[in-house]
Amino acid sequence: MRRILLKAMLGGPTLWVAMVMVLGAWAVQAQAAATTLTVWHAYRGKEKAAFEKVVANYSKRAAAKGIEVTTLAVPYDAYADKITAAVPRGKGPDVFIFAQDRLGGWVEGGVTVEPIGFFLDDQTRSQFLPNMLEAMTYRDTVYGLPLNYKSITLIYNKKLVATPPKTSGELVKLAKRLTDAAAGRFGLAYAYNDFYYHAALQNAFGGRAFDPGPKPVLNAPQNIAAMKLLLKWIRQDAILPAEPSSALITSLFNEGKAAMVFSGPWFLGEIAPGIDYGLALLPTIDEAGGKPMRPWLTIEGVYVSASSRQKEAAYELAKYLVSEEAGLVLTVEGRQLHTNKAVYTHKAVADDPVLAAFRRQLDSATPMPNFAEMTVMWSPATTAMNTIVRGSATPEVALERAQRSVEKDIAALRKGR
């Protein structure tokens, strides 16, 4: 190159100008060859800071390959609709983060998520905690890499509860002692009229939303049995507040008027600084033969957009995000529950009581269904829950109505495909 430049300088102005033009063309080509990957997410606060730190670390390393990574935080309320609208039209991100409950709908709708089984190697498959990769699988095809998980667990006020209950019998006995409804104090508080929270109790009985097919079974006998136990906790044992909104539950716990709650990691940020709290496994259910409560797992995955023009580079980024190195930052700094099992061998994670507690709860949790049909289950199930707890219908009647409603909606959904 030095000889070429010297000849150009000695060759006079014409040759020099020509040489400058050639070098400029090379620079333009090099710039055009650079790859920019765009990642969408909905994180805020510590999660956002940790995620962007991890992406920046990757971007620095990938710069040598001509790869630059940018991130965009999308408000959660508009996030799913934005993906559904943008990606099939060839717009939007190369990579996006979202929970598994929308996966089936996106696959059935087409041109949103890219199958990634072709890229997956055995080492990557084996690095995840149990049930994680399965949540990213739809009709035997893998569409995403699992990034983090969330579930509910038992959170208790240490000032009021010395030893957390291990069984439903212990739970009710302790909660009764700590309840004074007239004074607005309750032994237990959780959003029991929300089907997501109720699923933990339902699953203990062997209940479920769907049988294989998927076939909806909201009216299954096990679901009815779970609802009857919930009604006992509300009416006979009287250990739960009426109208359990998230705002009420937070207020009760922070005022020392709720000794225990069933909730997830999102609740911890709402706990007042002066509350000394602990976490424990959800209790086993005596009425279900001693089976554990099995909360639903919400598993966020890293998806490669079907419209991305650089799918291989996008997958390599996704693979890094689920690595041990990235996972340690996302877990320790972002307070996420990463899916890479090696992360939990690090002292900073293993010695953290909050992270360790949610990791223990994982062993008795189950992934939330990712069927397309799941989207039409929520409204009828929620209506049934509210009807039952208000006493407007028996569990048998309300769940049968919900079953018929879901069957009708699923038939319409499948007809429209």
Task: Name what the model sees in each region.
Residues 94-97, 259-264, 278:
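Paired acidic/hydrophobic, glycine-rich loop segments that form the ligand-binding mouth/hinge
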Residues 264-278, 283-383, 414-415:
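C-terminal lobe and pocket-closing loops
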Residues 4, 28-108, 122, 242, ...:
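Conserved N-terminal structural module of periplasmic/extracytoplasmic solute-binding proteins
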